[in-house]
Design a protein with these regions (language model features):
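Short glycine/proline-rich turn/loop motifs
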Residues: 26-29, 182-191, 210-212
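Bacterial N-terminal signal peptides that target proteins for export
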Residues: 1-7
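Juxtamembrane amphipathic/hinge helix adjacent to a transmembrane helix
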Residues: 196-218
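Stable alpha-helical elements in mature extracytoplasmic
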Residues: 41, 48-49, 115, 127-131, ...
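The canonical Cys-X-X-Cys-His
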Residues: 49-60, 206
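Electron-transfer interface patches adjacent to heme c in soluble/periplasmic c-type cytochromes
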Residues: 73-151, 156-177, 184-199
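N-terminal signal peptide c-region/cleavage motif recognized by signal peptidases
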Residues: 14-16
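Electrostatic cytochrome c docking/interface patches
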Residues: 21-47, 58-69, 214-218
């Protein structure tokens, strides 16, 4: 019962102090700690995935019931707190349904220039390190249509959806022997709700969950 109450609280309330192509790995590049045996991390990652990814992205090759079974989240908790989509009649989807959203392909193309991709297999296609550093390296660029750019994927059409958590940062450049500039690190210009270490841990949880999506038979 205590475990169940703690889990419901984690799903109900926001975490406190709580994607194609790529650039070269810079000095800022770090590898996440992927651990599919860390159930608490996977549960936190599922919450982040729902709250910050699923408005635009799907994981349509994965079913909610697998999330419930594999991550030890009761089906009623999943249905009440993680599933927000409905069928054509307006009835809320249940735990047996696929992890879809309500965004149409046409709307995605109009809003972002191309429809946001499904994320079920992204960790297998790109690798955990790519996703982790992509999520951490959005930086302010006023000339961009989204107001930001990304060190891993220059010209990314995705806005900085994690800005409330991370805040906004600017790149710090170093110069090589040929005079070419490279991003060395980042400095915060606006603090988010999390400290840098807290944000890194949260993104590690999210990456952990995305690795699970592509490798459910663990």
């Amino acid at each position: 019962m205590i475990k169940r109450i703690a889990l419901i609280a984690a799903v109900l309330f926001p975490l406190s102090g709580f994607a194609a192509g790529g650039g070269p790995q810079g000095a800022y590049w770090e590898q996440p700690n992927v651990n599919l045996g860390n159930e608490a991390s996977l549960q936190r990652g599922a919450q982040l995935f729902v709250n910050y990814c699923m408005a635009c992205h799907t994981a349509k090759y994965h079913r909610w019931m697998h999330v419930s079974d594999d991550l030890d989240i009761p089906a009623d908790v999943v249905e009440e707190n993680l599933i927000w989509t409905t069928d054509e009649s307006g009835k809320k989807h249940q735990v047996g349904t696929l992890m879809t959203n309500s965004m149409t392909t046409e709307y995605g193309e109009d809003a972002f220039g191309k429809a946001p991709p499904d994320l079920t297999l992204t960790a297998r296609e790109r690798g955990p390190g790519w996703i982790y550093n992509y999520l951490r390296t959005f930086y302010v660029e006023e000339s961009s249509t989204t107001g930001v750019n990304n060190a891993v994927l220059a010209g990314a059409s995705m806005p900085h959806v994690m800005w409330e958590l991370q805040g906004f940062q600017r790149p710090v450049y170093s110069e090589d022997e040929h005079g070419d500039k490279h991003i060395e690190s980042f400095e915060l210009v606006q603090q988010g709700s999390m400290s840098p270490d807290e944000f890194d841990r949260a993104m590690n949880d999210l990456v952990n969950f995305m690795v699970y999506l592509g490798e459910p038979a663990r």
